[in-house]
Design a protein with these regions (language model features):
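ABC ATPase nucleotide-binding domain helices that frame the ATP-binding cleft
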Residues: 44-47, 143
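The feature captures the beta-strand-to-loop junction immediately N-terminal to the Walker
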Residues: 36-38
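Non-catalytic connector elements of ABC transporters
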Residues: 249-338
């Protein structure tokens, strides 16, 4: 049985336009699940409805088999971390983390023990007496995370907590959050619009669009087998082709309205290759190139005037110059039709 379950959730802010449209979603115990989608798709509204900060107009929300739809936030035993750290400026690290425990009226010895354990877990040892103004952005976010989990909630909600942090630090925090979540085995829902973040951190990804779940699956399933044109356009950097462009390339009719090909599925060669039945073959010239980290991307204009992007690990051999003639092939199983 699912640990968290959304059943036919409906939500409107103006009484007419639905932000959440009869949405159904399940989360297994101990998983880190990501709600991934563009701004305005309803992902934060869904998260806040689970926390009890937003009412719903229809449906029900269940945690561990219990209907919590009408429970106030304080009765749901949920920890939440926002993009804003919301730390108390007049309290040091230890005091900020201990705040929730004091509200639960725990004894001082238990509070001290729990705070010490969490500080070690989030790697803030030695910062106990520091105030928020003395901390970096990453340290502040770890304090906010520690404060959310020290009370041992049943569920942890993370609403774009890393979006205001620079790229390098964000990658380190992504790994730390995942490590902590696994160590505590806490059921977690993470909201982001960053596909790379979702791929790195998630057990399961739910791609959202216009108040609905477009597709659910593991990161590998979502990336390699997008079920809709929207998912293909939002995940990765697929080459998205119209049916007419694809027919130009292949000289064959297609029943699909859209075609998607991953850039890394396109192989390139300086010479023509032997043909097989399970591949498609194109010819063209290099019109642009970019390097992102260790990924080299070529933009190739085929002889039919269709632009394709081909991605590969950067190597010092088999490099192509702009204007170079190039021969492409792609396995037919990597050509997705919608």
């Amino acid at each position: 049985m699912a640990y968290i379950e959304f059943r036919n959730i409906r939500k409107s802010y103006d009484g007419e336009n639905l932000v959440l449209k009869d949405l159904n979603l399940q989360v297994n115990e101990g998983d880190l699940v990501t709600l991934l989608g563009p701004s305005g798709c309803g992902k934060s509204t869904l998260l806040r409805s689970l926390a009890g900060f937003e009412s719903i107009d229809g449906g029900s929300i269940h945690i561990n088999g219990q209907d919590v739809t009408d429970f106030p936030p304080g009765k749901r035993n949920i920890g939440m971390v926002f993009q804003q750290y919301s730390l108390f400026p007049n309290m040091n690290v230890a005091e900020n983390i201990a705040f929730g425990l004091k509200m639960q009226k725990m004894d001082a010895a238990t509070i001290k023990e729990k705070v010490a354990r969490i500080i070690e877990l989030v790697e803030l040892s030695g910062k106990e007496d520091h105030y928020p103004t003395q901390l970096s952005g990453g340290q502040k976010q770890r304090v906010a995370l520690a404060r959310a989990i020290v009370t041992e909630p049943k569920v942890l909600l993370l609403d774009e907590p890393l979006s205001a942090i620079d790229a390098l630090l964000r990658k380190n925090l992504q790994k730390q959050i995942r490590r902590i979540q696994k160590a505590l085995h806490i059921t977690t829902i993470f909201v982001t619009h960053d596909q790379d973040e979702a791929m790195l951190m998630s057990d399961v990804i739910h791609v959202m669009a216009s108040g609905k779940i477009e597709q659910s699956g593991t990161p590998t399933e979502i990336y390699t087998h997008p079920e809709t044109h929207f998912v293909a356009s939002f995940i990765g950097n697929y080459n998205l082709l119209s049916s007419s462009d694809f027919e130009k390339l292949t000289q064959k009719k297609t029943q699909a309205s859209q075609i998607a090909i991953r850039p890394e599925a396109i192989e390139y060669f300086k010479e023509p290759q032997p043909r097989t039945e399970d591949h498609l073959y194109f010819k063209g010239k290099v019109i642009d190139e970019t390097i992102s980290g260790n990924i080299l991307s070529y933009v190739i204009e085929t002889d039919q005037g269709v632009h394709l992007r081909a991605d590969h690990l950067y190597r010092t051999f088999n490099l192509l110059d702009k204007g170079a003639r190039v021969f492409l092939k792609v396995e037919k199983r990597n050509v997705l039709e919608f």
